[in-house]
């Protein structure tokens, strides 16, 4: 397996397998040899595009204009080959005429030996120069693969043959037609899968745990039933576009044995594939899957197939007598093309042997480190920092008595803020441990988190050098401390809003957004109430100046009344705050 530099979320993100859609920049070097897009569809048999050349003879060093034209197409791959050995490597190199629509590729370690599209925009004509190399074969032909759209493409469209002067005439080599792979028959399921035998006769993975696909449309079921030397696999879930399962040696993407059921034009295609490191999954053909069947009813897609437990000599297929982590995913697909998933795949907590004793298990859509990261950030920036701010802002006169050498309010405030910083630091490290580095696929969330971490550290340093109460610099400290703290809280809330939608911790919605808005309103409302109360309380104080003697009206009763009110508001606020926090922590725990 590959190193954990790329999260398991890529399992479905990289199932977006399209010669054009997966490679919008035209970087299709991996297809140089066979010139075959990995679409999982049969190429068209009658070319609709044409290759023409500016001359029919050449000498080493000549430049020959090559034109590919025809109906609008999105992607292409153009190469020159030895006309007498079409399976050989590309010959010579190309020079671009319009670098805005085409680009050079390096095939077989020869720079510029192929040309491809630069973008998936539609085009009707491509012109390039082919540079004849020294030692070129006697006869050269040009081959092009053209992609009109995902499932409509032509492979190795032949162009004219050009020859060097004074060489034996070109004779077309005897055609060798490769046998077409046998297409297994696919039938329709007559009834829905059921989960009654899970844990008894079937090895089942379900999400939510113990759900029933016959009663719940959202239920995702994966079951394995051993039958002598083969295993029957069943998948059921919402008909968003595809269902997939993969067997993995660890919890990271790479070198995995995968199977995908893809909905296209109200037909379900069952396709084996394999994953290779960080590259796109490769659809496999001719694999010995048997008894394939599918069903599409009431928004639920179901598919099944049988495969032998051991497949000696078949590349990329795992021995199912061993134990593996199991990935289960579903998502959208358009025209047979799998799209980026919105949620992490369900991953079993440990390795299992699906052909062993029947079990009924679940899994998690989020790995433990990411769940702990989210939980710690919620505790820190929803609860500890919020309560700490209220204490410092409104409760100085309420808890002014000394506690361990300092005012009680200050001790509580300092403890809560140190806790916030400690939780933030721990939570900040966890994604780096999980991914082995910076996450470049999480949008603005990690950048906002980094800013929050920096501000939290600066706040600690600033607080450590707090000037004495009557020092002239104290007012500047107060404003700086307040400004940085307020900025950190606002940015932290924004980071939490964004983090809730990331695939690694995709909390179910839309309640999460409303709950976060509710928390913000709850906190802001509490601050407004305490501000109004403080203002009204100050109005009760009347200072009279008579012969330089200040007479303070009796304030003891009003002061006591104000303290009680503040304590009641704080108690209610903490209860509400903990309610919001519990909602989010419970949602994380259920992932």
From Swiss-Prot:
Its EC number is 1.-.-.-. Residues 216-331 form the DOMON domain. It is found in: Membrane. Residues 13-179 form the Reelin domain. Residues 335-533 form the Cytochrome b561 domain. Gene3D superfamilies: 1.20.120.1770, Reeler domain. Heme b 2 binds at residues 413, 481. GO terms for biological process: intracellular iron ion homeostasis. Its cofactor is heme b. Ferric-chelate reductases reduce Fe(3+) to Fe(2+) before its transport from the endosome to the cytoplasm. This is Ferric-chelate reductase 1. It comes from Bos taurus.
């Amino acid at each position: 397996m590959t190193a954990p530099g790329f999260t398991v979320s890529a399992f479905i993100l990289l199932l977006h397998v399209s010669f054009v859609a997966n490679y919008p920049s035209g970087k299709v070097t991996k297809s140089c040899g066979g010139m075959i897009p990995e679409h999982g569809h049969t190429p068209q048999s009658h070319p609709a595009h044409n290759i023409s050349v500016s001359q029919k003879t050449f000498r080493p060093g000549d430049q020959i204009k090559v034109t590919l034209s025809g109906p609008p197409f999105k992607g292409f791959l153009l190469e020159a080959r030895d006309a007498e050995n079409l399976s050989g490597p590309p010959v010579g190199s190309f020079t671009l005429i319009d670098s805005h629509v085409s680009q050079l590729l390096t095939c077989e370690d020869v720079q510029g030996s192929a040309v491809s599209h630069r973008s998936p925009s539609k085009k009707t004509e491509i012109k390039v120069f082919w540079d004849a190399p020294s030692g070129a074969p006697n006869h050269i032909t040009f081959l092009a693969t053209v992609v009109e759209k995902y499932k409509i493409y032509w492979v190795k469209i032949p162009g004219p043959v050009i020859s060097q002067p004074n060489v034996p005439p070109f004779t077309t080599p005897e055609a060798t037609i490769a046998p077409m792979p046998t297409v297994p028959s696919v039938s329709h399921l007559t009834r829905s899968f059921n989960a009654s035998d899970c844990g008894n006769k079937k090895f089942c993975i379900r999400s939510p745990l113990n759900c029933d696909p016959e009663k719940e449309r959202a239920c995702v079921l994966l079951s394995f039933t051993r039958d002598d030397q083969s295993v029957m696999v069943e998948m059921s879930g919402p008909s968003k576009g595809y269902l997939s399962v993969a067997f993995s040696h660890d919890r990271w993407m790479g070198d995995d044995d995968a199977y995908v059921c893809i909905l296209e034009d109200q037909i379900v295609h069952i396709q084996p594939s394999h994953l290779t490191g960080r590259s796109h999954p490769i659809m496999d053909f001719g694999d010995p899957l048997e008894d394939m069947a599918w069903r599409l009813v009431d928004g639920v897609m179901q598919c099944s197939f049988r495969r032998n437990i051991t497949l000696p000599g078949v590349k990329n297929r795992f021995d199912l007598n061993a134990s593996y982590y199991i990935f289960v995913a579903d998502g959208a697909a358009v025209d047979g093309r799998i799209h980026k998933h919105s949620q992490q795949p369900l991953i079993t907590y440990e390795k299992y042997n699906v052909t062993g004793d029947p079990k009924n298990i679940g899994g998690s859509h989020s790995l433990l480190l990411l769940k702990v990261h989210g939980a710690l950030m919620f505790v820190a920036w929803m609860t500890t920092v919020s309560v700490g701010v209220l204490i410092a802002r409104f409760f100085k006169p309420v808890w002014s008595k000394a506690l361990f050498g300092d005012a009680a309010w200050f001790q509580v405030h300092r403890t809560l803020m140190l806790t916030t910083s400690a939780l933030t630091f721990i939570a900040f490290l966890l994604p780096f441990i999980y991914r082995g580095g910076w996450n470049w696929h999480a949008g603005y969330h990690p950048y906002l988190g980094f800013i929050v971490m920096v501000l939290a550290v600066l706040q600690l340093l600033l607080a450590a050098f707090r000037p004495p109460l009557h020092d002239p610099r104290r007012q500047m400290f107060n404003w700086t401390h307040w400004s940085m703290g307020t900025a950190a809280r606002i940015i932290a809330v924004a980071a939490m809003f964004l983090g809730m939608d990331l695939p690694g911790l995709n909390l179910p919605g839309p309640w999460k957004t409303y709950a976060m808005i509710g928390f913000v309103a709850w906190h802001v409302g509490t601050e407004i109430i305490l501000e109004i109360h403080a203002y009204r309380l100050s109005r009760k104080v009347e200072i009279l100046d008579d012969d330089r003697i200040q007479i303070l009206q009796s304030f003891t009763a009003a002061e006591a009344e104000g303290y009680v009110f503040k304590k009641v508001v704080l108690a209610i606020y903490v209860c509400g705050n903990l309610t919001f926090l519990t909602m989010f922590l419970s949602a994380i725990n259920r992932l």
